[in-house]
Amino acid sequence: MKNTQAPSAMPIHKYRPFHEQIAVDLPDRTWPAKRIAVAPRWCAVDLRDGNQALIDPMSPERKRIMFDLLVRMGYKEIEVGFPSASQTDFDFVRSLIEENAIPDDVTIQVLTQAREHLIKRTYDSLVGAKRAIVHLYNSTSVLQREVVFRSDRQGIVDIALAGARLCRQFEALAPGTEIYYEYSPESYTGTELEFAADICNQALEVFEPTPERKVIINLPATVEMATPNVYADSIEWMSRHLNHRENVILSLHPHNDRGTAVAAAELGYLAGADRIEGCLFGNGERTGNVDLVTLGVNLFTQGIDPQIDFSDIDHIKRTVEHCNQLPVGERSPWGGDLVFTAFSGSHQDAIKKGFEAMAARAQRESVDVDDLVWAVPYLPIDPKDLGRSYEAVIRVNSQSGKGGVAYLLKSDHALDLPRKLQIEFSGVVQAKTDAEGGEVTSNEIWAIFQDEYLPAPETESDAKWGRFELGSTSTANENGDHVTLTVTLRDGETVSKATGEGNGPIAAFFDILNARGINVHLYDYSQHTLSASESATAAAYVEVNVDGRRLWGVGIDADTTTASFKAVISAVNRSVRASASSVPAELAGV
């Protein structure tokens, strides 16, 4: 078949290939023949490199939540800030130290430029810390030297060495703190290799690495400029040319400008690196830092312990989304909502047969399925190992069916359902159509939706919609986030007032329900108005766990808070109805 592609009109004359900018020549490379057998040392830089790239940088509270998450997951080296750059970062580092929040086996890392007042301020922030890495950096690339610093190589070396000497000089400002050093030739990928090795080796002479006090040399792809194999070649070349190599921890810091940061990190690790810096789910400037979740779970899929706990990936994702105020993509490797979902009928059939084959083999060998080597088509990992269920994997409805239902609800009724609620409701529609057959119109879909999620108006139904019905509501004694809530609530045939407390209206409402023996836990919440007018009605959606059932509820009201209460009641009533009909928890609402 003839290739009919044609030249584009794009201005390719503006760009030069990487090999014409920086020479990386390693014909005797050895890394392609190597295999990864053990996890690298990890350093999470979410609190600095990730935080600086956020539209809304983390508050101290969100920073602490992120730090605690990283500690629980098992990260032992955590970059916590640039204390000389802002009072916020300085205060956060101090709070971690003064509140004894840093476990004995965790080392914090702080960033500084090579300036005297910044380095002194950095050491001031570390007073009282048991152990810390001082991360010194200055930019070394050809472009930065010419455009930003207007300096020759020696001028850049002088900056690095002056900074390194000041670091050693100011160690006395943090007595009792074990100080370790990291040096980064920033914009390393745009730096000539021989110059990168020279400036790193001169910095090493100042830092004086020993077996007990190794020095980290960090080689950042500050901007990803070439294919991952080129980065790996440069890492192997540097590993061969660094002095005191046995006392150097060679570290990688890939960015994702070309979309290949994970591959660059994995190949760079094969090429001789010992350590990798990155962020959870790849947050960071521009297209982000390398994704530590992808790197870690990739190791796990190969039977290599990542030495990091990813067993509750949804909690990790929700926490990161809260701290970063940015969503994790639905197809983000291992953590996205859709990564284990098959819409293709042939894929679903293969997955189903894979599960059946695993079960049959376990029975033949008289072992538990979890004791077998995982082997299911289209699923490179058991979703349960990341805390996921099989519910989304084995559902029968097609993508078009789900999309069509969601489109009609949005276009005809202005309801913009969250994706996971779309999936749940498409199962409800499928169950109805399987039982009754025939074409499903927009009006019929709306009727099914009302019957499942919304209380029918008294004029349209004589039947009780559910156990609970909301009356009036009021909040009082608001002190910061603390709320005391009073509601009028119908519980069966009884109408009474009830009071609850919590760190917000929904938490206070959960307190009221808990007092009635209903155990409710929130997973997800969203809301929107049904029109653009000032008096618009609001729709609220909640995903909750009600006494072991994970399901959605929907509430519609002129008041957004009341809409959220109604959504919770919707979910609770659905759970009660499912219990009464003995529907299994994972099929509640279907």
From Swiss-Prot:
Gene3D superfamilies: 3.30.160.270, Aldolase class I. Pfam families: HMGL-like, IPMS_D2, LeuA_dimer. It comes from the Bacteria. InterPro entries: 2-isopropylmalate_synth_dimer, AIPM/Hcit_synth_CS, Aldolase_TIM, IPM_Synthase, LeuA-like_post-cat, LeuA_allosteric_dom_sf, LeuA_N_DRE-TIM, PYR_CT. Its cofactor is Mg(2+). Its EC number is 2.3.3.13. Catalyzes the condensation of the acetyl group of acetyl-CoA with 3-methyl-2-oxobutanoate (2-ketoisovalerate) to form 3-carboxy-3-hydroxy-4-methylpentanoate (2-isopropylmalate). This is 2-isopropylmalate synthase. It comes from Leifsonia xyli subsp. xyli (strain CTCB07). The lineage of its organism: Bacteria, Bacillati, Actinomycetota, Actinomycetes, Micrococcales. The gene is leuA.
